[in-house]
Amino acid sequence: MARNFRDKTVVVTGASLGVGAAAAREFAKTGANLVLVARGLEGLEKIAQELSAQTEVMISALDVTDYVACQRMLDSAHDRFGRIDVLVNNAGYHKRGPIENLDPEEIPRMVEVNLSAPLFLARLILPYLERAGGGAIVNVASLAGMAPVPGAATYSATKFGLRAFSFALAEELADKNITVSLVSPGPIDTGFIMDNIDEVTDITFSQPMSTAQQVGAAIVAAAANESTEIAMPKSSGILATIAYLSPSLARRLRPKLQAKGARIKAQYRSRNRS
């Protein structure tokens, strides 16, 4: 039986735009109380204003790598709503390019936001979930955590780590009525890819893009149905699974996928200029 989120409390990080905002909208439809977290106050205020007619919304502008601030946020959320039931670890950071071209400071930043912060937030929220009698943690990873992408080596590594953490944590918490789910999307049409088309690797364009709304709906479904992992879109998830199981086969397929992606990327670039 699927979970009912009415009057439950859901914490969403990276909630001011894109997938996080989409997940907030989808959870609002279920009647859940929302705790929306992001660095930018203006974006949080905008999404809160949009959703406040549907449900109770609390916002908290903070950096997810500031664990003292995260603890205060959770305490405040519990004080306001009396319970916390779901954590969506969605906040992420991605700096594209070969590792030799990356500013060395970008590497620990990606690790801290994409991997360390979800681990710490999961740890911080556990007492609240146990107090509520159980709950759900949904970690937003990427198909790059199954099939690493050249030009995104550090990002891929963080998502591989988040995937491993999710599966292990699910086993640790199985007897506590706390589920841990993973949502692993491919490229997402949030505008960033098209606005930075020259920085995006050709192979990215070889796969169909999901919308933020589709990923947001998958996050709610994962929490409701206690899914282990939702890889999306399905066709790309199958391809990523093959690449994960057979890296040598993935290397043989990569030139064809890069060529396909280059053609589609050129079409997008031409369309943007017209």
Positions of PLM-derived features:
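Conserved glycine-rich cofactor-binding loop
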Residues: 9, 16-17
